[in-house]
Each structure stands twice: as C-alpha cells, then as structure tokens.
C-alpha cells in the first residue's frame, strides 16, 4: 500500500496575533512548518501536498528556500479544514491507498506517530483513523465528542461547541 500526505497550512492563525503566518513561526531556528513537512515526508511514499492559502507566497517561499520537498495546493478561500483537504485532492497521487492529513502547526508530531497511525488504520480497516488530544482547557480549540465506546460522534469547531 502506498501512503500520501496532506499538510494543512492555509489558515491565518489569528490566535497568535502576529503578522507572521502561524506555520512560519520559528522553533529552534527554523519555521515550525518544516518539522511537519519532515515528519510527513518520512511517513509517506510521496512528497507531501502542502495546502497554502493565507500568505501563500510567503509560505511557499520559505519551504522552497529551505529546500524542503513538497507539492503545493492553493486554498483560495479559507472555508475550513474539510475544504482545505478537498483543495489538495487533485495533487494527491492517484495510486495512493492511504492519505495522512496533518497540520503545519504541529512541529512535535513525530514520523513514528504518523507511521503507527497508518499501520493502525490498515489493521482496523476503518474509513477514517485520527489522533486527538484530551486537554484540560478546551477554550481556543474545536471539540471531538465521542460515544461510550470511544467512537467519534462529530468534529465541532470552537464557535459551535458547547461546554460539554
């Protein structure tokens, strides 16, 4: 089975309150996006598809100047995560059996984690396999309510979320 990857990097990052695109904020001397690209590339059989939108030229220039391997997909209007993934669909290789989707602002996501996620997906044969974080303070983030057996009931953006 062949694995492809999509990295979402089109958002504005308004919570950061910075003129610099969120994914270009430096971590240990390089933009955090480059860590996400390295992890995705390591876990994929192809160059990652990088979805860019807000400050697209600046993000693209940073990736290219670093010599990172990526294909670019433009999300002209930032209409959410699902729309960002759809913006990348034509750039994903046709022979890919599995597509990993991750975010460009996750510099601590390790290649091993992505490979394990892909392996679990293949073993379980699900339609969708995802990781999530259980946090103490949900403010500032969307929610993933789950059923009694741990199954995903929905993915809810923060603006539409309830305290539960």
Residue ranges and their predicted role:
Residues 1-4, 31-103, 108-119, 123, ...:
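Conserved N-terminal catalytic core of the sugar/cofactor nucleotidyltransferase
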Residues 1-18:
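N-terminal nucleotide-binding beta1-loop-alpha1 segment
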Residues 13-17, 58, 139:
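Short N-terminal binding/cap micro-motifs at the start of the first secondary-structure element
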Residues 109-164:
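Conserved core of the sugar-phosphate nucleotidyltransferase
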Residues 24, 72, 128-130:
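Conserved beta-strand scaffold positions in the cores of enzyme catalytic domains, especially
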Residues 19-36:
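Short catalytic helix/loop segments, enriched in acidic residues and glycine
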Residues 11, 22, 105:
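Conserved G/P- and acidic residue-centered "switch" motifs that form tight phosphate/ATP-binding loops
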Residues 9, 52, 103, 132-133:
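Short beta-strand/turn micro-motifs composed of small residues
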């Amino acid at each position: 089975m062949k694995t492809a990857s999509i990295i979402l990097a089109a958002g504005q990052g308004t919570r950061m309150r910075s003129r610099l695109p969120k994914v270009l904020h430096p971590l240990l001397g390089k933009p955090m996006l480059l860590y996400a690209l390295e992890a995705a590339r390591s876990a994929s059989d192809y160059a990652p598809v990088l979805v860019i939108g807000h400050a697209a030229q600046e993000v693209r220039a940073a990736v290219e100047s670093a010599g990172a391997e990526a294909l670019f997909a433009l999300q002209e209007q930032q209409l959410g995560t699902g729309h960002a993934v759809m913006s990348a669909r034509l750039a994903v290789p046709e022979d890919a059996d599995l597509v990993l989707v991750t975010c460009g602002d996750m510099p601590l996501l390790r290649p091993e984690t992505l490979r394990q996620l892909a392996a679990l997906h293949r073993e379980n044969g699900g339609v969708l396999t995802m990781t999530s974080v259980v946090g103490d303070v949900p403010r500032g983030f969307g929610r993933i309510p789950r059923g009694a057996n741990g199954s995903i009931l929905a993915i809810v953006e923060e603006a539409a979320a309830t305290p539960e």
